[in-house]
Amino acid sequence: MLVIYAKLEISARDRVEIEDIRQRFDRLQGRVEPHFTLVFPFAGVPLDDVLDHARSIAAGVAPIPFRLAGVAAVPDPLSPAAHLFLLPDEGDQTISDLHDRLYSGVLARNLHPTAVYLPHVTVGRFERYEDAKTAAASLPAVDIPGRLSVMTIGDFDGEGVEDLHNVRLGAP
C-alpha cells in the first residue's frame, strides 16, 4: 500500500528524545523515521498518478515550521487500539491544510468518510486505551521545534515503509 508522509527535520538531540519514547512504546520504531502521516495507507491508484498529484500540490506549499508541544493518548477510531501522539501547537493548521489538499483529485476516494485528521507524530501503539493514557502520563513535557520540507511517497507493508519518491515542498 502507498502512503505519503513528511519526515521531521529536527535537531539530533530532539530526534534522540523521540526515538527513546518510540523504543519504549512503538513497534514500528526503527522501521520508519518519526514523521507526520499526510495520506494514510491506500491502494488502487497508480504510483505515477500519485507522484504527479503530490508534485502538483507540493508546488504551492512552502516548507512548514512546526513545534511539538503536547503528548496525548488517542483511541483508534477504527479499532479498540490506541495510540500515543506528539501534537504540534504550531504548524498544525498548515499541516492539516496540506493533508486536505492531498486528499483531492486522484486521492479523494481514499479519504475515510468519518475520519477527522489530527496532525501528530505517533510514538506509541497500544492494545488498550488505558495503557496509552498511562504511558502519556509517564512522559515529561516536550518542546520540539522543527520543519517539514519534503513529502515522501512510500510503500507500507504493515511492518515498515520503503521510501519510493521524495517531493520537495515549494518546488515547481
Feature locations, PLM:
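Histidine-dependent nucleotide/RNA phosphoesterase domain, centered on the 2H-phosphoesterase fold
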Residues: M1-P172
